[in-house]
From Swiss-Prot:
Statement: the UniProt record of this protein carries the keyword Repeat: yes
A Pfam family annotated for this UniProt entry: ubiquitin
Encoding gene per record: 7SL1
Domain named Ubiquitin-like: residues: 1-53, 185-263
Compositional bias ranges of the Polar residues kind: 77-87, 151-162
Name of the protein described by the UniProt record: Ubiquitin domain-containing protein 7SL RNA1
Protein family: Belongs to the ubiquitin family.
Additional comment: Transcribed by RNA polymerase III (pol III).
Domain of life: Eukaryota
InterPro entries xref list: Ubiquitin-like_dom (IPR000626), Ubiquitin-like_domsf (IPR029071)
Location in or out of the cell: Nucleus
One GO location term (cellular component): nucleus
Originating organism: Arabidopsis thaliana (Mouse-ear cress)
Residue ranges, annotated region (Disordered): 74-97, 151-172
Length: 275
């Protein structure tokens, strides 16, 4: 059967594998096809590195599954700890990307990922918010320790003072300097499908993204929000967020929009799960 191999450069190719093959045998076929030594290959499926001695069935590698191929560079003993941590961030982003199986979305995300990887060594932005600003007539919902606001698209926000100026021009470096709280900021959550509202959520930069998912589930339980029946991703700038990492680690900034996207599952996986 055929499986697809995505590379770090955004290109893809396919190989034919047999039912009982191990991961090592798959790598040997890649070496024969692409000329990449087995010792330099690292294969990922759904964000997990594959072990050479395990079989493809152990990882549920099915017809037209997509694997991510990372070519391991030669070790550099002089590499700084900072560069090592940044490389780990890149790897985790690529692993999260593997969770989306739809080919059209994969190509789109690959292009965005390339830009994010190119800029990963830039300094992280400052995250802060003077106060949570919401529309004058919006419904305010208290979720956990934060205040969230559900905003209709035609309503006007009521703001005042310095915080109003900060939101008016969030890209201005001068405005960023006058923000007082470096730990908290506001993200805008775009609901699923045809819900045209926008939910403003104040988050802590050091909180893991999975905390936002928990709050959204609570809102659904109260009948305030509709989430996909299937599994879903939280996506920012067209790239899935690593939910076990913080907003700061994911490079989510004040005023960014986070979308709720249904996770697509290959049809063959659904058939296999019912057998």
């Amino acid at each position: 059967m055929n499986v697809y191999i995505d590379t770090e450069t955004g290109s893809s190719f396919s190989i034919t594998i047999d039912f009982g093959e191990t991961v090592l045998e798959i790598k040997e076929k890649i070496e024969k096809s692409q000329g990449i030594p087995v010792s330099k290959q690292i294969l990922y499926l759904d964000g997990k590195a594959l072990e050479d001695d395990l079989h493809k069935i152990d990882y549920m590698i099915l017809f037209e599954s997509r694997l991510l191929l990372r070519i391991s560079p030669d070790a550099d003993p002089n590499q700084s700890n900072e560069q090592t941590e940044q490389s780990k961030q890149i790897d985790d982003k690529k692993q999260e990307f593997c969770g989306i199986q739809d080919s059209s979305e994969s190509k789109k995300i690959t292009r965005v990922m390339a830009r994010r990887v190119h800029n990963i060594y830039s300094s992280l932005p400052a995250y802060s918010l003077d106060e949570l600003l919401g529309p004058k007539y919006s419904a305010t919902v208290a979720v956990g320790g934060r205040t969230n606001q559900v905003v209709q698209p035609t309503e006007q926000a009521s703001t005042s003072g310095t915080a109003k100026e900060v939101l008016r021009d969030s890209d201005s470096p001068v405005e960023k300097k006058i923000k007082t709280n470096p730990m908290k900021f506001t993200v805008h959550v775009k609901p699923y499908q045809e819900d045209t509202r926008m939910i403003h959520v104040e988050v802590n930069a050091d909180d893991n993204v999975e905390e936002l998912r928990k709050e959204l589930v609570k809102m659904q339980e109260r009948g305030e929000l509709n989430l996909p029946h299937e599994a879903f991703h939280l996506v920012s700038s067209e790239l899935p967020l690593t939910e076990t990492k913080s907003f700061k680690w994911n490079r989510v900034a004040d005023g960014d929009t986070i979308e709720i996207i249904r996770r697509l599952v290959p049809f063959c996986s659904l058939l296999f799960s019912h057998t």
